[in-house]
């Protein structure tokens, strides 16, 4: 709608409705209320204040948008959670952590924690599964090296939820999959820029953590704790406040960590790594070799939703990769999975609440974007100086920060403005792959604010508080990612995507 035909009163009420609903959503979500109820209520509140038909927005805007998100991405949530639970119960994640501990040792404790977390999450293991396994490993290493316990959350965050989530090409993280239907890209979009961004994040994060370790040593500050991680992991998983925040920000319900049966007979490092390697290799083969060679013209038919291979191929590739890895994992570890049905049930169940929670956030964003006054917000975002890349980065950063969810904020941004950015990319000669990489990295920056579910869960698992550890999480998780984002935008603007 042309904003010039709206009266000042209508514009004012519309903007007030958006802000009031957002404040309501953030405030109650931070207190642990379920977003499944908060999101539709907040959306209806905004619609009512704006003078829009409330029930029509609930059933025709909110629900249709949420259902579209589930239709596009539920297979990835399902397979990702199932794979993560199988990796945990087979002892594979623990075996990788033990190998890192043995090979790198206490004198390289921070590096061991970062590499261990990166290996399992880049291979497709859900973030929360990695938290509950890497935290005890980090506790043992930090205690042996007498490194302050307060640095543990930042070290784990650097390895599990920064570059492996948003920058490394081919990562099966849901955030890396979301732009694919909007831009017709693959998980390997802008691989060179993604690798450079990863180097920036890792280098900056390790530099900061090493600096803090040296300062602590000079001040005679030691570990000063006990094995809080192993003692607090299970209660943290079941705490309702943590659970409600966590399922909005990541694709695994931490409640299901407690279910199933974790094998005490650990596989070898090679066996444990095989499924992770298969995820990356199969994903690459599908997106680079197989899918480009198949005839998928039939997808344009009404029967298949009048879509295209460019819109669905990236998701197909990740789905096949995770499926191949799951089959291989079960075959390699069958005797270590005596309660296979319980493990599979727990993994499948772990995907439901997160996908519904993020879908509800997406539905909320769709209602906000459908309000007439949103045209003002849209014009402001698109009018930000620096071109489409800067505008896209700012929009995604803000929405990820406000929702406390990288996937939710990213989807809301692309639902509202994705087609516009694609048109601007064609106008400015920007490769859609560059849009993809900028959007994904942007989603993983300001999402790590204090109310983010992953931050809350990580601190609980490590037995730390915001006061003790959040500053270092900000430095390695937010500042490092923002620095990498600036590098990618500058390089992409100068030399394009590569």
Walk through the language-model features, giving the residues of each.
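Long, contiguous bundles of hydrophobic transmembrane helices that form the permeation core
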Residues: 2-18, 50, 192-343, 461-462, ...
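Hydrophobic alpha-helical transmembrane segments
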Residues: 15-19, 37-40, 74, 107-115, ...
């Amino acid at each position: 709608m042309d904003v010039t035909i709206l009266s000042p009163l209508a514009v004012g009420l519309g903007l007030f409705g958006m802000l009031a609903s957002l404040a309501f959503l953030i405030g109650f979500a931070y207190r642990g209320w379920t977003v499944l109820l908060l999101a539709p209520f907040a959306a209806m509140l905004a619609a009512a204040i704006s003078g829009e038909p409330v029930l029509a927005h609930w059933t025709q805007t909110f629900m249709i948008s949420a259902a579209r998100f589930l239709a596009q991405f539920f297979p990835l949530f399902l397979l990702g959670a199932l794979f993560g639970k199988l990796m945990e119960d087979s002892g594979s994640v623990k075996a990788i952590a033990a190998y890192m501990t043995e090979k790198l040792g206490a004198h390289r404790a921070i590096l061991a924690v970062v590499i261990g977390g990166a290996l399992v999450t880049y291979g497709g293991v859900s973030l929360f599964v990695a938290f509950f396994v890497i935290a005890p490993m980090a506790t043992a290493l930090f205690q042996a090296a007498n490194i302050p316990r307060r640095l543990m959350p930042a070290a784990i965050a650097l390895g599990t939820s920064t570059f492996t989530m948003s920058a490394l090409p081919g990562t099966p993280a849901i955030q890396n999959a979301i732009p694919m239907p909007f831009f017709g890209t693959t998980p390997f979009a802008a691989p060179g820029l993604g690798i450079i961004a990863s180097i920036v994040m890792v280098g900056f994060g390790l530099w900061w953590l090493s600096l803090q370790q040296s300062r602590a040593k000079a001040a005679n500050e030691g570990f000063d704790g006990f094995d809080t991680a192993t003692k607090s992991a299970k209660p943290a998983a079941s705490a309702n406040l943590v659970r409600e925040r966590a399922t909005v920000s990541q694709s695994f319900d931490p409640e299901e960590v407690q279910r199933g049966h974790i094998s005490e007979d650990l596989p070898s490092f090679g066996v444990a790594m095989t499924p992770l390697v298969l995820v990356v290799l199969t994903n690459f083969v599908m997106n680079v070799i197989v899918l480009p060679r198949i005839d998928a013209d039939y997808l344009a038919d009404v029967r298949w939703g009048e879509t295209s291979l460019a819109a669905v191929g990236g998701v197909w590739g990740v789905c096949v990769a995770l499926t191949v890895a799951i089959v291989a994992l079960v075959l390699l570890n069958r005797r270590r999975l005596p309660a296979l049905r319980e493990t599979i049930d727990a993994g499948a169940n772990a995907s439901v609440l997160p996908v519904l929670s993020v879908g509800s956030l997406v539905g909320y964003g769709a209602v906000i974007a459908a309000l007439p006054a949103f045209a003002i917000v849209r014009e402001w975002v698109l009018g930000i100086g620096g071109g489409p890349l800067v505008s896209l980065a700012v929009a995604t950063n803000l929405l990820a920060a406000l929702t406390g969810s990288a996937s939710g904020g990213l989807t809301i941004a692309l639902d509202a403005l994705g087609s516009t950015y694609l048109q601007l990319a064609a106008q400015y000669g920007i490769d859609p792959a560059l849009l993809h990489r900028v959007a994904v990295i942007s989603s993983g920056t300001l999402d790590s604010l204090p109310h983010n579910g992953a931050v809350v869960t990580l601190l609980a698992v490590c037995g730390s508080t915001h006061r003790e550890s959040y500053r270092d999480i900000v430095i390695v998780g937010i500042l490092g990612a923002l620095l990498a984002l600036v590098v990618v935008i500058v390089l992409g603007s100068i030399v394009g995507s590569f």
